[in-house]
A protein has these predicted regions:
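Basic nucleic-acid-binding interfaces
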Residues: 1-121
Length: 121
């Protein structure tokens, strides 16, 4: 198929079913995420995901890492969403002064796909 530069591909019936668990760690696996602010951090990250128009199913911040379970629309790459979550939440943590030391997330992340049937379990 040949498209000229002015041609636009319109896919009004695009359908996707992408369920992804994203996991990323605090740099050095330091236990910086405290119970005292865990829920507020989770709400903040939830807001980032909602702003990106993705659906959050579950989130849990452990002391040294975070799990996020989302369904992704095809308009965003996993790496872009994760980059935005990590960058914005890192700034949020620093602004709140929740951590006395320099806070940052470890480079990289894990992403694991799930079938629709696994949502119930």
């Amino acid at each position: 198929m040949h498209l000229n530069k002015k041609a636009e591909v319109n896919m009004p019936n695009t359908y996707s079913q992408l369920y992804i668990q994203i996991v990323f760690a605090v740099k050095g696996r330091a236990c910086f995420i405290k119970e005292s602010f865990r829920e507020e951090l989770q709400k903040y990250i939830s807001g980032i995901i909602a702003e990106k128009k993705q659906k959050l199913y579950a989130i849990y911040c452990m002391p040294d890492h975070t799990h996020i379970f989302v369904s992704l629309k095809p308009n965003i790459a996993i790496s872009d969403l994760t980059r935005d979550i990590k960058a914005n939440s890192s700034t949020f943590i620093k602004d709140k002064k929740w951590v006395n030391e320099s806070f940052s997330w470890q480079e990289g992340f894990g992403a694991f796909s799930y079938s629709h049937s696994s949502l119930e379990s």
